[in-house]
Amino acid sequence: MKFWVISLLGFFLSLHLAHAETPKIIFDTDITGDVDDVLALAMLHNLADRGACELLGVTISKQNPLTAAFVDAQNTFHGRPDLPIGVTRDATAQKRDSRYLRRAESPNYKHDITSNDAVPEAVSLLRQLLAAQPDGSVSIISVGIAANMANLLRSPGDAHSPLAGPALIRQKVKLLSIMAGGFATIESNNHFLEANVINGIPAMQTVAQDWPVEVPVVWSGYEIGVSLPYPRQSIARDFDYLPHHLVKEAYLLYCGSEHDRPCWDQSSVLYAVFPEREYFGLSQAGRVSVAADGFTRFTLPKKDDRQPARDRFLTLTPAQRARALEAMVHLTAQPPHHD
């Protein structure tokens, strides 16, 4: 009897610990141009349906009048119509046209947000979400330009928290999983300039320089996503359980039916939610800096270096590549959960 009581206690304790360790995720995205943002958001909703993470909210870092409506349509499509959304109002953030955001205007996709004016400013929402969470519990996934992250770092105390941005991050955030830069030779180019960096160099420089050293940053470079092409066969066959599927339509509008789009943003999602499952390897700890032209440089600390090693970047073996891509396909194509 004693054995069974101990076993049951251990079982329930393990359940409690598993629940307590469920990652709390804020998704910061530049959803406008490339469609990998749409697939990454689908992954997060499906992971939340599985209980693998808790999705706290979505903030948008590029300017387009349809961003909030589209994200609300996708959140509603995935059964979370009230998920908080914030948009940048930084005039220096990149403006971008989109091939797929107008799907939010389709009657096939219900939602109630029709204007960016109806949602909070992104940094205000970030501060609100962070302040409401337990200390050291939030993982931020940033896939796009770093406007919102840089402005969070610059933010003063407010009604949500008296802490300025760096102190609030230090208190509440346990990981920044960021898709940006390049950390390998890419197509014989040793000085590759990646889009998320060069489309907002000052903001990415601010993040690389000023992000608190106590909070780890894991970078997914261009070379990771380009090694993980989302198979067009999945788009053709795995989304037909509904007559109208927002993710499939966005993919086809962006790149057509004959293209395997790299999983850049999805790689940062997969690592942030499952850092212990070894879908990826990690570099040694060091520091990332961003040059004036947008080149990301990773350096290992020297023995006399007073600057703590805060940054790592993802690596990928052939075996990990197969596992990671399979996971991404399943987690993207999973039918949405509806009550």
Segments (PLM) and residue ranges:
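Bacterial N-terminal signal peptides
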Residues: V5-H16
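N-terminal acidic, glycine/proline-rich low-complexity segments
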Residues: A20-D339
